[in-house]
């Protein structure tokens, strides 16, 4: 990934964080890494952990289509690792934020 793509991704995640905070989410972690993968944002709202995948584009296509079953399985493995590491047994869900030319789409509790 080049510097331009890195900056675009970082700024997109900043937009997502501002969106989540404005909707009452507490941001716990950003870019949580494990050997299985990465979670872009981990947040909490109403005692539920939210593991949020952020995808952004400046082109005309639907960002949600970029989450494949392979990517989703990596997200789930990383969630298991996070919960085990933090010894935090609580309800959780996987959410998605898509950013397309300043338009934000928020899809809660996704599954494949």
Curated annotation (Swiss-Prot):
Superkingdom of source: Bacteria
GO MF annotation list: nucleic acid binding
Disulphide-bonded residues: none
Entry similarity comment: Belongs to the UPF0102 family.
PANTHER family linked: UPF0102 PROTEIN YRAN (PTHR34039:SF1)
Protein name: UPF0102 protein CHAB381_0216
Source organism of the structure: Campylobacter hominis (strain ATCC BAA-381 / DSM 21671 / CCUG 45161 / LMG 19568 / NCTC 13146 / CH001A)
Organism taxonomic ancestry: Bacteria, Pseudomonadati, Campylobacterota, Epsilonproteobacteria, Campylobacterales
């Amino acid at each position: 990934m080049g510097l331009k793509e890195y900056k675009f991704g970082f700024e997109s995640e900043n937009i997502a964080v501002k969106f989540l905070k404005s909707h009452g989410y507490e941001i716990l972690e950003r870019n949580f890494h494990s050997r299985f993968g990465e979670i872009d944002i981990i947040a909490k709202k109403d005692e539920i952990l939210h593991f949020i995948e952020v995808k952004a584009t400046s082109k005309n296509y639907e960002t949600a289509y970029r989450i494949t079953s392979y990517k989703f399985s990596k997200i789930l493995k990383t969630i298991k690792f996070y919960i085990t590491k933090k010894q935090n047994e609580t309800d959780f869900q996987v959410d998605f934020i898509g950013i397309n030319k300043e338009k934000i789409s928020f899809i809660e509790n996704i599954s494949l």
